[in-house]
């Protein structure tokens, strides 16, 4: 029964991520149609990430007070409306406002979905189940940009947002029908003291710093890269293809993440941090389609390993009944990075070229590697 519930849950994740993936990477290009500069794109990415930063602990709190599955349904509903209202955009300011609400909706989806994985999976199977969840998520994001690129090229942005809304709506109905009635969350046990959490955060500080650097790179890829690719003449269809290739690499890494545990967390995270760094360098130095494709696949492959391995380390340092806190802390650290990353890039483009800005931002891949060495040695295995 539990396996059936997990399978249905993963289907809803796939459909929802398909709908979101169809449009999310094209919003920066859509903003450029209203005259958005790279500073504007940085601001859009920063506002979106700011919304995602304030969301995790709120969602974790709600998930602790009510059935997590209802919070999941609410998150899907928020995403549907945030996507639909993009149809009404008439300026860059409109997009900035709507991206704030879109950030809340998308982060609510990610956080509650990750909490549900920890609810439905035994502790010893969390890396494997996080990998399966990642496969469902990335399959949608893999196929979505391809469909979104074709729809945009053929029918325009308005129809893209409408179709995306319908797909997300389907996942909402699936969640209501398949998950609500039979969902069994983890039993609430006495929580650890506040001072206990402070000790955990101090012990994991290098790891959280690494996650922040990872978030900076994630914000750069999702908020800035589409506009960068568009500015050097890459079409909407090919931008969709680049993100689908990014998704293929993530998918492979998610599906095989549990195999890397035999090498140890420190070695694994150090290696993938360097892979991400090389991917960023490739994008910065060679602004042509094929090098961009290679760079995106390197980054995607690294990202696919970072998520399940890191969240497993974080969750093992929290009491089992406080998995929501572990997930929320992980997501908040990522979103702090995602908030400052696009803003830093936007400011760099004012004083130097776009390519050099990417080159300078690649240093965060090195920071990830340095924090990987320190962060995993202090974490409890």
Task: List the model feature ranges, each with a label.
Residues 2-45, 49, 205-211, 215-228, ...:
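Helix-loop boundary and gating motifs at the non-cytosolic
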Residues 1-3, 180-211:
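Juxtamembrane intracellular "pre-TM" segments in multi-pass secondary transporters
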Residues 93-101, 279, 290-298:
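Paired small-residue
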Residues 49-57, 141-142, 247-255, 338-339:
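Residue-level signature of mid-helix packing/kink "hotspots" within the transmembrane helices
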Residues 70-84, 165, 267-281:
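Structural signature of the two symmetry-related core transmembrane helices
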Residues 55-67, 253-265, 349:
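Helix-to-loop junctions at the C-terminal end of transmembrane segments
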Residues 100-137:
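Cytoplasmic helix-loop-helix junction between adjacent transmembrane helices
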């Amino acid at each position: 029964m539990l396996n059936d519930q997990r399978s249905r849950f993963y289907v809803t994740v796939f459909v929802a991520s398909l709908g979101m993936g169809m449009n999310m990477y094209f919003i920066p290009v859509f903003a450029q149609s209203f005259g958005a500069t790279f500073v504007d794109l940085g601001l859009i990415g920063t506002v979106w990430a700011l919304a995602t930063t304030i969301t995790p602990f709120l969602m974790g709190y709600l998930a602790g007070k009510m059935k997590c599955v209802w919070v999941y349904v609410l998150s899907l509903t928020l995403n549907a409306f945030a996507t639909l209202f993009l149809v009404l955009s008439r300026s860059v300011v409109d997009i900035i406002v709507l991206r704030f609400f879109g950030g809340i909706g998308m982060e609510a989806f990610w956080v509650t979905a990750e909490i549900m994985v920890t609810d439905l999976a035994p502790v010893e199977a969390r890396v494997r189940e996080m990998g399966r969840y990642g496969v469902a998520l990335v399959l949608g994001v893999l196929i979505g940009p391809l469909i979104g690129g074709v729809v945009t090229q053929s029918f325009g942005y308005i129809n893209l947002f409408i179709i995306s809304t319908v797909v997300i709506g389907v996942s909402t109905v699936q969640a209501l029908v398949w998950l609500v009635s039979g969902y069994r969350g983890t039993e609430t046990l006495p929580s650890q003291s506040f001072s206990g959490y402070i000790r955990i955060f101090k012990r994991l500080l290098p790891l959280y710093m690494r996650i922040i650097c990872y978030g900076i790179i994630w914000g750069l890829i999702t908020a800035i890269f589409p506009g960068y690719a568009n500015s050097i003449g890459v079409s909407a269809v090919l931008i969709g293809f680049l993100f689908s290739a990014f998704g293929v690499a993530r998918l492979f890494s998610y599906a095989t993440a549990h195999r890397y545990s035999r090498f140890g967390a420190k070695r694994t995270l150090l290696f993938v941090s360097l892979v991400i760094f090389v991917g960023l360098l490739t994008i910065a130095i060679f602004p042509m389609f094929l090098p961009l494709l290679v760079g995106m696949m390197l980054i995607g492959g690294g990202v696919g390993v970072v998520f399940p391995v890191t969240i497993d380390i974080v969750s093992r340092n929290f009491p089992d009944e406080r998995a929501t806190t572990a997930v929320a802390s992980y997501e908040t650290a990522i979103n702090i990075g995602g908030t400052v990353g696009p803003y830093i890039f936007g400011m760099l483009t004012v004083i130097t070229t776009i390519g050099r800005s990417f080159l300078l931002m690649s240093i965060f891949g090195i920071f990830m590697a340095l924090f990987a060495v320190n962060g995993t040695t202090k974490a409890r295995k």
